Amino acid sequence: MLNLGQVKVLEEKVAKAVHLVQMLKEENAALRAEIDGRGKRITELEQLVLXFQDDQTKIEEGILKALNHLSTFEDSAYGEALTQHAAKVLENREHAGLSEELTSRTQMEIF
């Protein structure tokens, strides 16, 4: 048979166990709330990453577009410079040809 001391010890142990279970339930609830909060934060961060990736893609496209425009401009400017140079060369040749023709005509008129 149980004596009064054993019952009190058992009662204290049960009270401690109930208290421990209650503390563990509270801790569990707090941890679940923390997990939920962190899950929401993860979702927010994932959305930020997607937006940054989208922005990065747009930036890269803009840079490539600008480089293409610059390349087109350079090609145009280079082509124009070549055209001007070729025109000057032809002009110089024509001028030289006219000078030679005038010189030879002058020489022929002298004789």
From Swiss-Prot:
Record Pfam families: ZapB
Any coiled-coil regions, as ranges: 4-51
Alphabetic keyword roster: Coiled coil
A single Gene Ontology CC term: cytoplasm
Domain of life, source organism: Bacteria
GO biological process terms held by the UniProt record: cell septum assembly; FtsZ-dependent cytokinesis
The protein's name in its UniProt record: Uncharacterized protein TP_0847
